[in-house]
């Protein structure tokens, strides 16, 4: 605990199959530290992207681009799972779902796509405002979902946002998800887009390994579907 902090130990517990014998050692703790950084870096990225955000900037759901609607659909589906797993005290399942969200859906996909929108679009553009609206929803829900697992980290992130020690993340409940966030047609469409993207990314990686390109931006893929 002195070296890595209590949240690393808590993360080790929830990431383990506690129906079997638990193993711990330097390599396992190192792996937990890497997992922890994924959560912490996600929260830190969201806080940075939301600098100066206010509710006046928020965009209605119907005005949002489809990518933002897909993220909200992901949150709606995840909310159902997490509520059910919380009732069963299945914190291992919650850890698995949240790590997949932060690693696959956000870091490797949504954040990667929307960084140009955040950095380059006009501050009052609909796309940028929609992106920050969704990121605020991500931050609110991630801090609440992570609070039982990474209690100190979630509180630190939440206090960085609210700046009120009396308003603890541990006094919050899971906010209800608006019914219109669940959108099966958008989910199917973007699942297909992600599969195509994975094929393209694999081809780009092969081209880099063969020395044909140095960076992805040097390529001009042609996709046949």
Question: What role is predicted for each listed range?
Answer:
Residues 1-64, 162-165, 212-213:
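Catalytic adenosine-cofactor/nucleotide-binding cores of aminoacyl-tRNA synthetases and other
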Residues 5, 39, 105-106, 146, ...:
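Conserved structural-core and active-site-/substrate-pathway-adjacent residues in large, well-folded domains
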Residues 8-16, 43-46, 98-102, 110, ...:
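Short alpha-helical scaffolding segments that buttress acidic/His motifs in well-ordered protein cores
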Residues 20-22, 107-111:
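Secretory-pathway/luminal and periplasmic proteins that interact with or process carbohydrate-rich
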Residues 24-32, 90, 127-135:
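Membrane-interfacial loop-to-helix junctions in multi-pass inner-membrane proteins
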Residues 33-36, 40, 72, 76, ...:
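Generic structural concept
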Residues 53-83, 111-203, 207-224:
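Acidic, turn-prone loop/beta-hairpin segments
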Residues 86-93:
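Short helix-adjacent coil turns
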């Amino acid at each position: 605990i002195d070296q890595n902090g209590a949240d690393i130990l808590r993360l080790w517990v929830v990431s383990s199959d506690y129906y079997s014998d638990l193993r711990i050692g330097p390599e396992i703790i190192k792996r937990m530290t890497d997992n922890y950084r994924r959560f912490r870096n996600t929260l830190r990225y969201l806080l940075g992207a939301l600098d100066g955000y206010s509710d006046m900037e928020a965009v209605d759901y119907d005005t949002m681009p489809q990518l933002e609607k897909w993220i909200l659909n992901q949150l709606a589906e995840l909310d159902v799972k997490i509520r059910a797993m919380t009732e069963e005290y299945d914190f291992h399942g919650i850890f698995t779902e949240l790590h997949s969200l932060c690693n696959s859906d956000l870091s490797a996909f949504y954040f990667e796509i929307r960084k140009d929108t955040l950095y380059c679009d006009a501050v009052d553009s609909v796309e940028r405002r929609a992106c920050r609206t969704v990121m605020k929803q991500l931050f609110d829900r991630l801090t609440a979902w992570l609070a039982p697992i990474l209690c100190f980290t979630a509180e630190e992130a939440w206090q960085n946002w609210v700046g009120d020690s009396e308003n603890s993340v541990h006094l919050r409940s899971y906010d209800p998800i608006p019914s219109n966030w669940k959108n099966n047609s958008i989910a199917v469409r973007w699942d297909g887009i992600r599969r195509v993207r994975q094929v393209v990314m694999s081809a780009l990686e092969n081209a880099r390994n063969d020395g044909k390109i140095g960076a992805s931006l040097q390529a001009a893929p042609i996709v046949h579907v």
